[in-house]
Amino acid sequence: MQELERKSCDRPVELVKAQYAGKKVIEFYGDYIPEQWIRAIGAEPYLICKGGEPQAPEATLDYSLRFMNPLAATMVGNYLIGADRVMPMADAVVIQQHDCHYGRMTEILEFKGLPIYKVGVPADFAVGISQQYYRHELREFKKFLENLVGVTLDEDKVRENYAKTNKIHELLRKIDELRKVENPPITFSEFIRLNHYTLRVDYDTSIEALTKIYEKLKDAPGAHAKNAPRILMMGRAVAEGDYVVPGIVEAAGGCIACDFLDEAIRPYRTNISLEGDIVDAFAEALYDTRDPQCIFQPSWEIRFERLKEYIKEYNIDAILWYQLAFDEIYDMEYTCYSKWLKELNIPIMKLESSYEYSREATAPLATRLESFVESVKEAK
């Protein structure tokens, strides 16, 4: 894992060298942007995935109301304070437009003169016209890439990248399966880092590293205390760097054995078809048939049925609802889930984060989480 971390941290330096050698650098945000196409056409991708620091969201207040979730605000704030080393040099910044938070933040980047390209992602994902619209947006993105780089997208290379993506997801699923045992050999803090690192590092390096990690983990002892309460973490995202909350839970004796997160994590439960049209294959896997995000509709009942499956499969004792500040749609979904889970006698705790982890803020946060873990222990 240390090698993956090092390569992930070194990625901006690699991009400078690649751009100097004549390659295009494309920074992007979101699962609905086909990174596989960016690599296939000969450009260098870099995912926007940072979070967990209050300075970046605060930097956007001169340009926007404060009522934007901190992950979306961090995307802009890191540029404003100079913490994003890639965005100033990027030949294009591609951002999916799937809700108002990212739409508003994208407008600020446009106002600052950055080379923004938007990919629309309709929220009513089950409707035929929305599925057609998203495919249209992908085809327009393909044209944009070809115009930017100056070559035609090689569809065989795209399928090769789909296959490598599927292999990465297969290995992450195998590691995830180990989390179903009574005492998993990997913590959530480690698992989410694997996701973040492989989102930045090239496919072959990721596959090699994940293969070695799985071989080591499959016979490894448990990484948690005996009879630790098994917790499922659900919400929009645990971004790169936003590791305080899972760290506190694990230090308190909890085991985050499963995750149900919408963004800033590999969609490792999906596979992309290697047959047929590359646009249809990507759209079907990531948009049509994947578990919908909270902000999509209809989704809450679909997601709750999936949640019940995870509770059973992973032998979950409690749910930690990790919500980003000002994410009002997640707040409404939580209201439904708290009622439905009460009927199943599954405890749930909502934790809202604005990425404020000062000593003064962390102390009461730790007390809440430690009390939650202890109460779940007592109820086991």
Predicted regions: what they are:
Residues 66-84, 295-308:
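Glycine-rich, highly charged phosphate/nucleotide-binding loops
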Residues 298-345, 349:
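C-terminal hydrophobic structural anchor segments
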Residues 335-380:
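Peripheral docking tails and interdomain loops at the edges
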Residues 1-24, 143-271, 300:
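A charged, amphipathic alpha-helical module
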Residues 6-19, 27-31, 35-36, 55-62, ...:
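Metallocofactor- and cofactor-centric catalytic cores in central/energy metabolism, strongly enriched
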Residues 29, 232-234, 322:
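Short hydrophobic segments within beta-strands
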Residues 74-147:
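Acidic/His-rich segments in extracytoplasmic proteins that coordinate ligands and/or metal ions
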Residues 31-32, 37-52, 56-60, 236-299, ...:
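Redox- and metal-dependent alpha/beta enzyme cores, enriched for Fe-S-associated oxidoreductases
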